[in-house]
């Protein structure tokens, strides 16, 4: 089983869409260990975007009511997120797509952050970067932290309108491989996810 951890440079960068694309492409299982906000969960979004019944969507280890930072959501509910209690699900040999909460330094409790969870799982990261003013800095800071922690990175997915100069300088500084460009879409559907899943393999094995 291969484990890919989907993280991003910020919140609302496109992690769930990219997770759906990867789950589709690899016929993998999906897991969101820590969900903050229960009105529209990422697991339910993934369910609506997959054609195949091959993938299992595993239940969250922590499902917190408020859509705020996980440490705050847990604290407000009188819960403590304990990393040792978050165990990888049994995928019966399937690859596993793990979707993080926010970015790599989002706190899970008073001492642990998302990056500690990545290390615990010994997962390979796929970084999602949506391009906006300031995103170069956010992307390079994320890459620097991943490198400092010796976390393996499979590659980067750029999400949103193309910005060739921003992409060039990010790749120059990080040495990352571009796995996929995701364009703005009027509506995200199963068909859109499937189309990107096919495109993913253009760069996946290089």
Swiss-Prot record:
This is ATP-dependent dethiobiotin synthetase BioD. One of its GO terms (biological process) is biotin biosynthetic process. Mg(2+) binds at residues 16, 99. GO terms for cellular component: cytosol. It is found in: Cytoplasm. Pfam families: AAA_26. The active site is at residue 32. Catalyzes a mechanistically unusual reaction, the ATP-dependent insertion of CO2 between the N7 and N8 nitrogen atoms of 7,8-diaminopelargonic acid (DAPA, also called 7,8-diammoniononanoate) to form a ureido ring. Signal peptide: none annotated. GO terms for molecular function: ATP binding; dethiobiotin synthase activity; magnesium ion binding. Its main location: cytoplasm. ATP binds at residues 12-17, 99-102. PANTHER family: DETHIOBIOTIN SYNTHETASE. It comes from the Bacteria. Its cofactor is Mg(2+). The gene is bioD. Keywords: ATP-binding, Biotin biosynthesis, Cytoplasm, Ligase, Magnesium, Metal-binding, Nucleotide-binding. It catalyses: (7R,8S)-7,8-diammoniononanoate + CO2 + ATP = (4R,5S)-dethiobiotin + ADP + phosphate + 3 H(+). Homodimer. Its EC number is 6.3.3.3. Belongs to the dethiobiotin synthetase family. Pathway: Cofactor biosynthesis; biotin biosynthesis; biotin from 7,8-diaminononanoate: step 1/2. It is an enzyme of class 6 (ligase).
